[in-house]
Regions:
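HotDog/MaoC-like acyl-thioester-processing domains
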Residues: 1-34, 114-172
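Hot-dog-fold acyl-thioester-processing enzymes
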Residues: 2-109, 170-172
Length: 172
């Protein structure tokens, strides 16, 4: 027994038997989601390092993202901007961590709108609403569309998008 009074002997020092224990952090099944259901992700601050790595990996070596002196003299926003595609990628990462682990099957389409600039040091989160769910012709999967709002620490909506995804159904 542990000091909290919880039985621990069953698994202490053992590797077998864990397959019967529920996995936490699993994604949602399409048939568990209802139109109108809302959720939000954890928040994440976008750093200078995030921008540098993203620009390097993607080849987006635009001076607006790489030259701080140019940004100071030419930018109308007065700070290092975050590429809109990086904002989107971070949002998808936040959603993957909280809603799609082992259940997401395919990303099919979306309409992405960048509404306001995001700059280094901004903290964003996704606020999502389920707007469509339906089964497909093949059993065990369905389509889910959400309307996602990307909100910064000032409660400003900086982007919106409405992905359509193929998602696993609850196992029978």
């Amino acid at each position: 027994m542990s000091k909290e009074g919880i039985k621990t002997e069953k698994f202490v020092g053992k590797t077998e038997g864990w397959d019967d224990i529920a996995v936490h952090g699993m994604g949602w099944y399409w048939d568990d989601l209802k139109v109108g259901q809302c959720f939000r992700t954890l928040a994440r601050t976008i750093t200078e390092a995030d921008i540098t790595m993203f620009v390097g990996v993607t080849g987006m070596v635009e001076e607006m993202f790489t030259n701080l002196e140019y940004i100071k003299s030419e930018s109308k926003i007065g700070a290092r901007p975050v590429p809109g595609s990086l904002v989107y990628c971070i949002c998808e990462g936040l959603l993957m961590q909280s809603t799609m682990q082992r259940t997401g099957m395919a990303f099919l389409e979306c309409d992405l709108r960048i509404l306001k600039p995001t700059v280094a040091g901004d903290t964003i989160q996704v606020q999502a609403e389920v707007v469509e769910t339906r089964g497909t012709s093949k059993p065990g999967r369905g389509l889910v569309r959400t309307f996602n709002r990307v909100v910064n620490q000032r409660d400003e909506v900086v982007a919106t998008y409405n992905p359509l995804r193929m998602v696993k159904g609850r196992p029978q």
